[in-house]
Amino acid sequence: MLQPATSSVSATGAPSTDTVPAGQGRKVLRAALTTASAGLLVGLDTGLIAEALGFIGRDFHATPRMQEWIVSVLMVGALLGSLGAGVFSQRFGRRLALGSATLLIAVGALLCATAGIIGQILLGRFLIGMAIGICTFTAPLYISELTSGSMRGTMVSTFSMLQSTGILLGYLAGGIFSGGGHWRLMVGLPVIPAAVLCAGCALLPSSPSWLAARGRFEEARSVLRSLRGDVAVA
């Protein structure tokens, strides 16, 4: 069992910590905020599609039923994404799961923005939905495993706060682009922040709980030392 001065990882992989030195606290904060920003992407799509849907229906002569499918296919993808997120993140790690989700958002948004047929939009929306399902499962879990007890609740709730912020930004951006009917710019907007976050995921540490659960205690101890301070083996 790992027994740190300021944090610990049990044999079952559950981290436990109450205080974090100031220097390490900044590292934890950066990692947690990077992860929580996935909520911004989740909310951004919700706000953007609400503004873009009317223009998509006009350009593709989509029936009201088809427009409903454009919205609801995302929910189908989100359901499947959330169902598979646990298995994926447990096998490959939280960091890779989150990075894959942001990549799916970028690909899905790009498909929607360049669509020549309605089916391509449906496919793009489905991929975005899968990414949302993965993000909403993985991001809060990953944050809780990186942060100390004193900041865990605040950082996990930041994911939800940024999700609401993303919805607001989506509506605002939609209002700006809707003046010229530029729906392709609207639905393609998430490509940029998704690509940035995908690159940022490569700089995130592996979850110490995930490492410990797989018997990689030395690596888990190294991550904890980097994030939270000295770690000793009991």
What kind of region is each of these model predictions?
Residues 1-234:
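Transmembrane-helix signature of 12-pass secondary carriers
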